[in-house]
Amino acid sequence: MPKVGMQPIRRQQLIEATLAAINDVGMHDASIVQIARRAGVSNGIISHYFRDKNGLLEATMRYLISHLGLAVKSRLLSLTENTPRARLRAIVQGNFDDSQTNSAAMKTWLAFWASSLHSPMLHRLQQVNDRRLYSNLCIEFSHCLPKDNARIAAKGLAGLIDGLWLRSALSHDAFNREEALSIAYDYIEQQLTRT
């Protein structure tokens, strides 16, 4: 019989083991056996908590998405200046948080994006995440720009965030947060100062 209170601990161990396995060998080669071994549990525990590998991958993506939301929220809550410019910058900072730009997270996100093209469940998660970013950016730009311009600016900044992140992930170099922030901030300034 499982110990009371072990479920959250085991789930976290398995999610962290999944991130580590994907970081080391990729999503395709990250087997249930390998993940269980890394977590120090039996294979059956994965089935018990997640049904199968797909359930574990979904939980891992939800974990990353949750940490992304927390990173953005914490930056928004810590703002001393509550302006659209400051809020846009906070959203960018949250998207470039270490929880999203460390090696394991970046490789898992890349694998997730590729898999979402073939998995309705992962595609749905990706769509929710994309819409949330776009909506948050659009709201902030709409405080300063006409509606159509705000939408275009939001699409541009969302694309820039994803593009900077993707180029770094594919380069195998550590994410250059300062450079990415500088580029994104410059874009925000260009959009907010358009006449």
Swiss-Prot record:
Indicate whether Disulfide bond appears among the record's keywords.
no
- Any signal peptide, and if so, which residues? none
Checking Gene3D superfamilies in the record gives: Tetracycline Repressor, domain 2
The record's section on Pfam families has:
TetR_C_6, TetR_N
Pathway it works in: Amine and polyamine biosynthesis; betaine biosynthesis via choline pathway [regulation]
Keywords, comma-separated and alphabetical: DNA-binding, Repressor, Transcription, Transcription regulation
The answer to keyword Membrane applying to this record is: no
Q: Which GO terms describe its molecular function?
A: DNA-binding transcription factor activity; transcription cis-regulatory region binding
Q: Which residues form the HTH tetR-type domain?
A: 8-68
The biological process GO terms on file are: glycine betaine biosynthetic process from choline; negative regulation of DNA-templated transcription
Positions of the DNA-binding region: 31-50
**PANTHER family hit by this protein:** HTH-TYPE TRANSCRIPTIONAL REGULATOR BETI, HTH-TYPE TRANSCRIPTIONAL REGULATOR RUTR
Question: What is the purpose of this protein?
Answer: Repressor involved in the biosynthesis of the osmoprotectant glycine betaine. It represses transcription of the choline transporter BetT and the genes of BetAB involved in the synthesis of glycine betaine.
* The name this protein goes by in its record: HTH-type transcriptional regulator BetI
Native species of this protein? Pectobacterium carotovorum subsp. carotovorum (strain PC1)
